[in-house]
Amino acid sequence: MPSDLAKKKAAKKKEAAKARQRPRKGHEENGDAVTEPQVAEEKIEEANGRETTGDGEVDLLTKELEDFEMKKAAARAVTGVLASHPNSTDVHIINLSLTFHGQELLSDTKLELNSGRRYGLIGLNGIGKSMLLSAIGKREVPIPEHIDIYHLTREMPPSEKTPLQCVMEVDTERAMLEREAERLAHEDAECEKLMELYERLEELDADKAEMRASRILHGLGFTPAMQRKKLKDFSGGWRMRVALARALFIRPFMLLLDEPTNHLDLDACVWLEEELKTFKRILVLVSHSQDFLNGVCTNIIHMHNKKLKYYTGNYDQYVKTRLELEENQMKRFHWEQDQIAHMKNYIARFGHGSAKLARQAQSKEKTLQKMMASGLTERVVSDKTLSFYFPPCGKIPPPVIMVQNVSFKYTKDGPCIYNNLEFGIDLDTRVALVGPNGAGKSTLLKLLTGELLPTDGMIRKHSHVKIGRYHQHLQEQLDLDLSPLEYMMKCYPEIKEKEEMRKIIGRYGLTGKQQVSPIRNLSDGQKCRVCLAWLAWQNPHMLFLDEPTNHLDIETIDALADAINEFEGGMMLVSHDFRLIQQVAQEIWVCEKQTITKWPGDILAYKEHLKSKLVDEEPQLTKRTHNV
């Protein structure tokens, strides 16, 4: 007969099997169900980067961000009713409304998030996409407690921990079980409990946790050496990658990502796209990259006119479906308006005529009343279209910039970034620089502008050439207390009339109150537009654009692409947006191994090359991680 211990083990296994068949209240990898909402919230906060161990000191910037988020939450009001079953893994909320500082962002709409679907949330800058994600992440909408949520909100704070440690520790249940198992390993009296712990750890694949964490970090660009550096030695962009790695490692039931590609290079973007394709629960993603949305999403949610509208398929399918629906809607609208005009005209002409005509007029009046009562088709309200503009720069004879035998390293004993570069660029140059992080793409732009000097060799520039460089930190140079109008008038005093400057700023999507509000009150996307307006009116011959799409919406990026294509001068671009590169670049230059080589195909061929590299690297990575 089976022993009592064997019976208990069998019972535990059955219970564990049942638990695996239903979603857990805590994180999927945290095991046992979380019964206290407060505990669940603490786990989510810890996962999002809050320091919970050590000396208890919180990075000052992190504290400021927390205070800022609290103020935003206090100014936010959300109402909605859960319409799906409380135990369902799908989330259906009706009568959803969202206001911020009294401004209505959503009104009486519905939120539908189904298990196994990956949603792209799209809409114009400032329409409230990030605000909606925050409301979901903070559970201000009625989402059942058994659905755990991970909302990636900020970078990891600087600390003594390594990226690998930070990713591993996010799985709090596994870490607790391993500590408990280690304690009980020497106590024979707790043999049964120890076996239960080992069984649970086996369910969590605890022995593979480090390998999985290392694989995720590698995909996001961390070499084995970088995975063991201290977090305080990384920039904010790299610490954001660590936070993203934690989100992917913990595998929550609902994952909310707001512009996850902003701090990634093309290699990491391709890896992340392939990784998210395998996400089997609920993913809600805000991204400005059409290519990324096409690769990841199974559904699109369009935030428009205070409503959430749902489309099946990726971004390209959404565009096609929306166009067809709007064409049909306008046909229906015009048909109804024609019918209404005809009936009103008939009623006016024959309402007081002969008995027969009067009866017909009354019949048409009843038909008209029924049409009005049942609701008429609305006219299609199109999104506002932007039209960016780079002023004519005039012609200067080639060569504009000559790079002759240039080598560069940041320090005398540091690694060589470039060695013996030799090339020229002119006003007809349209180049995208690609390559892994650290290969020197941004460094090259700084060398060409003169912000950095070559270690060896020479860079010759035409005496009259003007260069405009857009980079990720340009926003930091803005005077936040000034309005866009005041800032531009200060930067370009030769423009005396405010109305003339208003027209200039208006071409970059800043209108009305946005022009006269303090810059600090603008969204990140609107601040980027101020920077683009400032850059354009420097009247450069050469545009050097380093990640110009961060924080911009899809419509703004398309307007930027059109403006670049109409620009008379030369352009060099660093971007993780494959579609923008495809739109504006005539050549692809690969920065790698201390040199620059011209890619023989277009950017889409380069993307396929990166995908094939991922397939080739996977077995080597697994083998290397096993040997760690």
Swiss-Prot record:
One of its GO terms (molecular function) is ATP binding. Pfam families: ABC_tran, ABC_tran_Xtn. It comes from Mus musculus (Mouse). PROSITE patterns: ABC_TRANSPORTER_1, ABC_TRANSPORTER_2. Residues 1-57 are annotated as: Disordered. The gene is Abcf2. InterPro entries: AAA+_ATPase, ABC_tran_Xtn, ABC_transporter-like_ATP-bd, ABC_transporter-like_CS, ABCF_EF3_subfamily, P-loop_NTPase. The modification Phosphoserine is found at S517. This is ATP-binding cassette sub-family F member 2.
